[in-house]
Amino acid sequence: MDDDYEAYHSLFLSLLGLCPSKTPINENAPVFDPEPVIAHCFKQFQQKDFRLPQTRRRIIMVPRKEDQTPLNPASQPQAPPKPIPSFKVLEARDIQEQPEDRKTWLSQRSKLRQELESFGDVKRWLENKPSITPSEAKVLHMIHEEQSAQPNASQATTRTTRKKAPRLSRLSRQMVPQLQLPEPPALSVMYSYLHSRKIKILEIFHKVGQGENQRITREEFIAAVKAVGVPLKNQEVEDIVIYLSSLGKHNTITMDILANTYKQWSMAQQRSSLATAREHYILAKHRDSLKGPLKKQEVDSAPQLPKVDLLTVPAVDTQMETRPMTLEEMEEVGKRYRERQRQHKLTIPSIQYTEQCHLVRCGNRHFDEHCLPSTIHGDMRELIDSARRHNFLVYLQCWKLCKSYGLPLTEDILMKALLYPGDKIIFQMDKVCPIRQPGGYYSDWKVFSPNLALLRSQGPGKSKRTDKKTPKKSKKMRFKEFEEFTRKLKVKRSSGLQQTHPNSFWPGHLLDKLQLYLPTVATDRSLALFSCVQHQPHVYPATYHPDHWWPLRNKNYMTHAHYDAAKVYYIN
């Protein structure tokens, strides 16, 4: 045994190339001993309890349910997994198999039933399935029975479900939904006509004894309806035939269908009559409750004379013809009413009354003069006053815009341009002077100074006396001061009588080209508030000033300049 081991050991070393040769080259050289290396590498294999490692196991513990009752208390089985909803068709062996624990199985089935009922329309879901199980067919049968219990349910659907429900063996049969036509109004007309004539629907066909499922053809039905004399057109009779035949199994009319439809119509008539009777009873009771206190008042009051029933004019609803007044219109109406009441009580003339109204002022002279009422009589006065109020609002808006945009238009400029100076009532010797015309004065005495007018009125004798009484005052001035004084006088007073410019009367005559310039609005000549009429310049001004002016050409336009001034010529 030892010899075999040594032979095997030497063969293994020779294969590894670690065995020393029998004829060593150098006996003193160190020899590699592989035994410790092999013993170290194969140490685990030499142990007695050496075996392969086992695979890891995963154990899942399911919590115990209260409904679960184990058969053996020693060995408690795990609870079955929850049913996973799937759309696969159940096989026969899956249906027959039931778990051992019945309570658990019943709880799972009830839970599945609740989920199915809360899922949505169970009837539609089951009818659209290609194949159903016996339990699903049973549920569908119960749904159809519940619907057939209602009075307004269709008879065709109930009949098909009752026949198809017991057939549980046909699992793969598909439920085809049927269409139901709406009930034509001519059917109720026909039944009401027969009811008023006390004719039964089954008696007109003379087939009562032949059975309820006896079929009635289209020609027989039309002939019977015409024989009774029902007031219907041919198209309406055709609609009734189509509707009644759609309720049958083979698109035919039977006695059973006629009886059922007539019964449904009579029940609907009874419900409507009950509802109307209840409404009439409530209205009558309400009227009696209202008449009770009225009768007591009539008894207490004294007997009155009998009233004559005459024609009364119907009340006209004027709310649609009127409109609500604005605040400005209400204020104007109030002002007119107060003015009328005051004028009836006044003993002074109206023009003096208007002058008294002028005493109420706001403090700003321009505003007061603009807002004065006009002295013109008639309708023109109201138009002028409304125009002045409108212009005052325009002035306020322009002032706000100029202030917000920062335009260099002062308040004085806007007042001169937009506000009217107003009519001024002036008394002279207890007489009202006429309104000043453009370019003139109220009277001639204003042209002269007040001292000269006073002297003229007194006469020549009185004027001499006044000259004697008033001493002359002399003042010395230099030549330059006298020259400036005379220059100012020439500017103030022109030659001859004083004449005013015709445009001086109109507001804004000092503002030639006034317009509101806004940064966001393009410049437009039509926005000018006032335009001054001026003479157009001559086409060739050089012809009228040949001595001083001469046309000079600079590039592409012509300029007029003094010919003696310094000139710079450009040669293009």
Swiss-Prot record:
Which positions bind Ca(2+)?
A: 212
Domain EF-hand per the UniProt entry, residue ranges:
196-231
UniProt keyword terms in alphabetical order? Calcium, Metal-binding
Checking InterPro entries in the record gives: EF-hand-dom_pair, EF_hand_dom, EFC12
Task: Drop me one GO molecular function for this one.
Answer: calcium ion binding
Q: Annotated region Disordered: where? A: 62-85, 146-169
PANTHER family on file: EF-HAND CALCIUM-BINDING DOMAIN-CONTAINING PROTEIN 12
The name this protein goes by in its record: EF-hand calcium-binding domain-containing protein 12
Q: What is this organism's lineage?
A: Eukaryota, Metazoa, Chordata, Craniata, Vertebrata
